Structure formats: C-alpha cells, structure tokens
C-alpha cells in the first residue's frame, strides 16, 4: 500500500473510531441527511453533530450536497471503497494463510494415517 493511501486510510479509521461519529456515519450511509435530521436520531446536539460531520469530512469520508436550501451529508463512495479494499486485502491474506494451514494439517493427518495402516 502506498504511503499516501495508508495515511488517508489511517485518518479515515481514526475518524470512525469515535462511537458517536460511527453512528453518524451509519445514519448517513442509509440516506443523505441534514445535520438536524442526524441530531434528531441521536442523543447529541446539532452543534455536536456538525463537529462530528466536520471530522468525517476532514478525513474524506463524507461529502456535502445541496438540495434546495438543505445541506445533506452522504458517504464519499471513493473513500468507503478504499477502506473496503484495504479490509478485503487483509481478508485475502488471512484466507490464504488459513488455506495453507489447513492443507498442512491435512497432509500431516494423511501421513499419520498411512503410518498407522502399516
């Protein structure tokens, strides 16, 4: 992973590390929402929601769109894809290691079974 991408993903994961911020992100992932709409669904004030959205935006996780007089927040699809690609790469490595270990155990069992038959 390139250093710049690693830094960007680290900022994104750090931004999502706050439980309230993670809830905010989950809400806007379902549908674009305004600050007031997010605040209505959480036990935090509008100014607090605004601050959480600012942190998410600074990390590149959300984008803002204007719909008439409303400002709506939504996840940035490129940023989410980058995080998913990173997690998928970890999963791929883990599966490959698991496969190697399973094959090793199968070979050892087969060898033990052959010895017992002699």
Q: Locations of the language-model features?
A:
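Catalytic tyrosine of NAD(P)H-dependent dehydrogenase/reductases that use a Tyr as the general acid/base
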Residues: 17, 42, 73
């Amino acid at each position: 992973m390139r250093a710049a991408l690693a830094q960007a993903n680290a900022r994104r994961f750090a931004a999502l590390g706050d439980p309230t911020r993670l809830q905010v992100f989950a809400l806007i992932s379902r549908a674009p929402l305004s600050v007031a709409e997010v605040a209505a669904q959480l036990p935090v004030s509008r100014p607090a929601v605004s601050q959480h959205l600012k942190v998410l935006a600074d990390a590149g996780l959300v984008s803002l769109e204007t719909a008439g007089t409303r400002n709506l927040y939504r996840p940035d699809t490129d940023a989410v894809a980058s995080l998913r690609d990173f997690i998928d790469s970890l999963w791929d490595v883990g599966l490959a290691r698991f496969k190697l270990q399973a094959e090793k155990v199968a070979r050892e069992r087969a060898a033990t079974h052959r010895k017992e038959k002699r």
